[in-house]
Amino acid sequence: MKFTGPLVPATLVQRYKRFLFDAILTDGTAITGSCPNTGSMRGLTTPGSRIWLSEHDSTTRKYRHMLEIVEADGTLVGINTGLPNRIAEEAISAGQVSNLDSYDTLRREQRYGRNSRIDILLSDAEKGLAYVEVKNVHFSRLSGLAEFPDSPTERGAKHLEELGDMVAAGHRAIMLYLVQRDDCSRFRICRELDPVYARAFERASTRGVEAYAVKCQVSPLQIVATGPMMVDEAVPAVL
């Protein structure tokens, strides 16, 4: 997924109220921008961090700049939760997700379950339906290990339950964890930060929900999926 224009480098001053951040551009200009990530962004909001911003001239936007990338421990990390579905679609089409590249049709944001929308719905005359829920992953505490979630997510647990219902109805259901950083080779569910989600993940797995993780290469020009990652069991990490 290529950005529509070159990203603007800056230095993070603070991120606050979930939706906002202050930064200093390279010419010394102080700006306030929007943050397209309402999660905790644990480990990615350190003042002084190098960041990259997209620019938007639309008169419908209150802020011209939007946060896209944060540098953490020398690694570029994509934080925009509005991008993973597009990146996942490219990854599936490129055959980077096990057994999902040969479906006839791919549709996004389709209604299903209990008044929910599935991120990607694959359909095929012979294979039937495959429901794909995409989660953005940017959290890493241990070298080489990406984790999700970085804070409690009731909505995420609900999605796992609904995916299990799709399996019970005779369809495939897949959790696709899109890791927007390239310094990790393994992925796990973070039981310590959300034990409820971890239990929901285990229940979904026993019901037949599949789980895959895909690594991304992040740059100020584009974010592209580069291939699958190992998914570890949801056991406590040793810090």
Swiss-Prot record:
The lineage of its organism: Bacteria, Pseudomonadati, Pseudomonadota, Alphaproteobacteria, Hyphomicrobiales. It comes from Sinorhizobium medicae (strain WSM419) (Ensifer medicae). This is Sugar fermentation stimulation protein homolog. Belongs to the SfsA family. GO terms for molecular function: DNA binding. Pfam families: SfsA, SfsA_N. InterPro entries: SfsA, SfsA_C, SfsA_N.
